[in-house]
UniProtKB/Swiss-Prot annotation:
F-type ATPases have 2 components, CF(1) - the catalytic core - and CF(0) - the membrane proton channel. CF(1) has five subunits: alpha(3), beta(3), gamma(1), delta(1), epsilon(1). CF(0) has three main subunits: a, b and c. PANTHER family: ATP SYNTHASE LIPID-BINDING PROTEIN, MITOCHONDRIAL (PTHR10031), ATP SYNTHASE SUBUNIT 9, MITOCHONDRIAL (PTHR10031:SF57). The chain crosses the membrane at residues 8-28, 45-72. Belongs to the ATPase C chain family. The gene is ATP9. The record marks 57 as: Reversibly protonated during proton transport. Signal peptide: none annotated. It is a multi-pass membrane protein. Keywords: ATP-binding, CF(0), Hydrogen ion transport, Ion transport, Lipid-binding, Membrane, Mitochondrion, Nucleotide-binding, Transmembrane, Transmembrane helix, Transport. This is ATP synthase subunit 9, mitochondrial. It is found in: Mitochondrion membrane. Its main location: mitochondrion. GO terms for molecular function: ATP binding; lipid binding; proton transmembrane transporter activity.
Length: 83
């Protein structure tokens, strides 16, 4: 039973990958819109976009790490049954 709970926890931790994909899409969309509105700030906007990508990918890299920790490193303590 506890093994199943660990699998559910690891699966829930990887949902953050979907959130990271949405975040990267938002960063790219905002970058394109800002360059379209003000082309003279394209270099500055590109720098901010790269920073946004890096921060979003940092969150995305934590998700598989947490899933690995939940599924294989955290030990299961079996409860002793009375009787």
């Amino acid at each position: 039973m506890l093994e199943g709970a660990k699998s559910i926890g690891a699966g829930a931790a990887t949902i953050a990958s979907a959130g990271a994909a949405i975040g990267i899409g938002n960063v790219l969309s905002s970058s394109i819109h800002s360059v379209a509105r003000n082309p003279s700030l394209a270099k500055q906007s590109f720098g901010y976009a790269i920073l946004g990508f890096a921060l979003t990918e940092a969150i995305a890299s934590f998700a598989p790490m947490m899933a690995f920790l939940i599924s294989s490193v955290i030990p299961i303590k079996e409860s002793k049954k009375e009787g």
